[in-house]
Amino acid sequence: MSDQPMNEVQDNAAPANPWLELRRLTPARIALGRTGTSLPTCAQLDFQAAHAQARDAVHLAFDHAAISAQLAEKGRETILLHSAAADRDSYLQRPDLGRRLNDESAQTLRDYAAAHPGGLDLAVVVADGLSALAVHRHAVPFLTRLEEQASAEGWTLSPVLMVEQGRVAVADEIGELLGAKMVVILIGERPGLSSPDSLGLYFTYAPKVGLNDAHRNCISNVRLEGLSYAMAAHRLLYLMREACKRQISGVSLKDEAQLNTLESDDSAENSDRKIGNFLLDGPAVPH
């Protein structure tokens, strides 16, 4: 009997794949190889594992208490809200319910707005969306980076408003109830087979109930393997400045931030993920 561990499955029968080197450049499922007319065992097992991770991300419970505790350590107030979707099944089967707050949460915001008149520049919303995993991993690090830059520019931000069973449009109601000039929602994106923890940012100027996607700007794939926290914050602040100047957001407001002037996170946050591609020189990702 072989001494090879059972969990180290090798496909010795799989022929060499000349595209294999391309896998250094992307997490996409390319150059999987073949054995006969089928995928090698390792590729099939990897696919099944990725699919299971994506399913788990959709159904993972939103640990808002842990996020609140982390933000409290940084001196940030949080307010817990809930959409009109009572549970996960309702959320998945009735997308419209996830776009509105329940009555209790709406009243909570009315009371807060009455106690804090004068409005604010940006309402900051965090919602589980379709991947609570993304929010657990990336919301606090991103908010830390955003608030450092926003404070330096003099923007006024709301407490962090955390929404259970929330969808993107719930931010419009929140912004309207608070009288905020702008709103951004950090939300878990639909998991992919190579990205179960992708965080999306959706920004709206003059939020109100009934706006559609054309009124929002999206900054997607915020995670260590995607768009860095620093770049995402840089883009969002650019959109905030331009939105206030032009009083628009969405398809009429293009993201023309000069990202090439931004240091792309030389900190430990991203120091291990810089790569090149076919056209640009750059260090390769180690195997």
UniProtKB/Swiss-Prot annotation:
<keyword id="KW-1283">Bacterial microcompartment</keyword>
<dbReference type="GO" id="GO:0031471">
    <property type="term" value="C:ethanolamine degradation polyhedral organelle"/>
</dbReference>
<keyword id="KW-0846">Cobalamin</keyword>
<dbReference type="InterPro" id="IPR042255">
    <property type="entry name" value="EutC_N"/>
</dbReference>
<feature type="binding site">
    <location>
        <position position="218"/>
    </location>
    <ligand>
        <name>adenosylcob(III)alamin</name>
    </ligand>
</feature>
<dbReference type="GO" id="GO:0008851">
    <property type="term" value="F:ethanolamine ammonia-lyase activity"/>
</dbReference>
<dbReference type="InterPro" id="IPR009246">
    <property type="entry name" value="EutC"/>
</dbReference>
<dbReference type="GO" id="GO:0009350">
    <property type="term" value="C:ethanolamine ammonia-lyase complex"/>
</dbReference>
<feature type="binding site">
    <location>
        <position position="189"/>
    </location>
    <ligand>
        <name>adenosylcob(III)alamin</name>
    </ligand>
</feature>
<comment type="subunit">
    <text>The basic unit is a heterodimer which dimerizes to form tetramers. The heterotetramers trimerize; 6 large subunits form a core ring with 6 small subunits projecting outwards.</text>
</comment>
<feature type="binding site">
    <location>
        <position position="168"/>
    </location>
    <ligand>
        <name>adenosylcob(III)alamin</name>
    </ligand>
</feature>
<keyword id="KW-0456">Lyase</keyword>
<dbReference type="GO" id="GO:0006520">
    <property type="term" value="P:amino acid metabolic process"/>
</dbReference>
<dbReference type="GO" id="GO:0031419">
    <property type="term" value="F:cobalamin binding"/>
</dbReference>
<dbReference type="Pfam" id="PF05985">
    <property type="entry name" value="EutC"/>
</dbReference>
<comment type="pathway">
    <text>Amine and polyamine degradation; ethanolamine degradation.</text>
</comment>
<comment type="function">
    <text>Catalyzes the deamination of various vicinal amino-alcohols to oxo compounds. Allows this organism to utilize ethanolamine as the sole source of nitrogen and carbon in the presence of external vitamin B12.</text>
</comment>
<dbReference type="InterPro" id="IPR042251">
    <property type="entry name" value="EutC_C"/>
</dbReference>
<protein>
    <recommendedName>
        <fullName>Ethanolamine ammonia-lyase small subunit</fullName>
        <ecNumber>4.3.1.7</ecNumber>
    </recommendedName>
</protein>
<comment type="similarity">
    <text>Belongs to the EutC family.</text>
</comment>
<dbReference type="GO" id="GO:0046336">
    <property type="term" value="P:ethanolamine catabolic process"/>
</dbReference>
<keyword id="KW-0170">Cobalt</keyword>
